[in-house]
């Protein structure tokens, strides 16, 4: 419905200038017109009495409606109607009781069906209208002006009108259905409301007979059943039996009852204080019901006011928590003035479980699988040898070490006591491997809870870009990232609500972790990534899935239960692309079900379906090292075959000839059954062309591997230059000026200077398709993934042999005089250029 149409329909026709003046917002006519409201809208728009012109009144109304003033009081109003209906029934005012009951049913049905946003919009309007109607109820109606639906629509935006009309139509429909339900109430004895009605009648009879104890018990049963019916929807009726069982033992199950009946769209977790408040509120409502039956009106009113106050406080707390889950967070107003941060404080208690219950814990001996899982117990802490001690890369001979062997040493440190050769023969890309230790401090230098807090304070991290907030509940995984910077109060607020925190690329902020990644990338010859996962107790942040990487899960703090499954399809083994989220029913029996404690390591190949859950009273902080992504033969062939085909097409005219005219009539899925001679001839011809022209040569394979290695140079982390290396590289060089102002460097190369590459894989010599020769390197890469364009140096073809000699000689040093170049000056010039780009290191530091 268009806004103009609404305004025109609402504006009265004729020559009544006074009435038109009211719509135009003027106040010339002292006698304010009486604008009636349609009876069908009486429940939605009650008469409001405000001061000022008609335009000012409506603007005042909507300025208050759309303020973030707190939670809706719809249920409170509905509760009052039910109490009033019951009181009218006691006074034999059947007609009034029936009317109030219809209104209650309509409001309740509306609560159950409208969306959260529509519900919030409608409830704010209804609550404000009810508030003003109550304040002005004692004044004379003849002296007050009324605001009709037409006035409201005049000042609504198009979006507000759409919401208003949807809710209005829905309420009218609910009222009609509620009327039918009320007419058939007494005859439908198989539904819960009939039993509730009978209990209330019995309670009234008992009250008249002065059977106070029995009346109170009947009233409690009535309220419990009614509340249960009001809070569940059709799709949740299967929970009714559970709710009734909890109601039977209310004193013990009050907290559980609040969990079952709370179906808000925000985070489902709630604090113990909130649960206790709900229990106390429920008891007050029961007491108010009993007081009404005993005609203690004053006491009943006091209990009802306490109940409303408790509901308002509880809803305010829920709203504050929910605001963190929105894509856009905005400040809220306190007392209509000062802005308050909508973030949850760090000191909030931990939330309840957010996870979808995985299969029950079973005896590992009972798990039967074709995959062989090997668990290794590391030696006791007192028997640790040097291999298990904290990794250290700085030695007196660091400048002489081999970076590839250093990477192997780090692998050995991670998987100790398993030897690397044994690991790569029996585990790598084959099956999972679990190493359990008794030393919880084994990986403590890499990261900690405190380090994460410092990162949030000292660095500018953005949600989604650097940090994710996730949750997995009721079989559904959600990402709750707001926009903007991830400040500590917001992050720890999410964590307190039971959400998991994933920090992307923590090695950019933690030198120790970055050192591990840079050394490992030398060994694996590929990008090595690290992600951090922090999960609160009794929670799960991610759905079951598999990844396209070889994963090393390093448990740093706390404990976490891991369940691994075989891929559902054979084609998913050693998967090249990560999967989507699996439902629990799609998975078979886990091939491993173990709890990782601090110091433990779990390895599993790509394609292994996995999920992880924290235990009660135990948080978890772990790092996942990801290696060997997109490093398969398939990736090589994807790079190689287009190159081979292009070269073959340029060389062979047979590949450039057109297809026979009858090709489309004999080849294709529709012609598989046609076993004619021309079809077979075409198939054999294509196969011969592939065999003859598309077999890659050794040079083709070298060129394709160079292209893959060039990609690694772009993705790799820059090397960490240790202090003993710094004085031998350009990073330790210093320059000054002489008396004439000329630049003077503190280094100078000659033919006797010994040099070598800084790292084994610091550069890649690539001959491009156009014939140019380039040196790609990652010495100047950023800490973020592919932050800059690839770095390269273009050299002369005859200078490539000098670079090749440096590559083959690593890790040994060569004198510049040994470089295969024609002149000594050219040898020194090439070595100096490579050193100044951070690619070479001298054997002795410059003085």
UniProtKB/Swiss-Prot annotation:
It comes from the Eukaryota. Its cofactor is Fe(2+). It is found in: Nucleus. It is an enzyme of class 1 (oxidoreductase). It holds the Pfam family RIOX1_C_WH. Its EC number is 1.14.11.-, 1.14.11.27. The modification Phosphoserine is found at residues 323, 330. Fe cation binds at residues 545, 547, 610. Oxygenase that can act as both a histone lysine demethylase and a ribosomal histidine hydroxylase. Specifically demethylates 'Lys-4' (H3K4me) and 'Lys-36' (H3K36me) of histone H3, thereby playing a central role in histone code. Belongs to the ROX family. NO66 subfamily. This is Bifunctional lysine-specific demethylase and histidyl-hydroxylase NO66. The lineage of its organism: Eukaryota, Metazoa, Ecdysozoa, Arthropoda, Hexapoda.
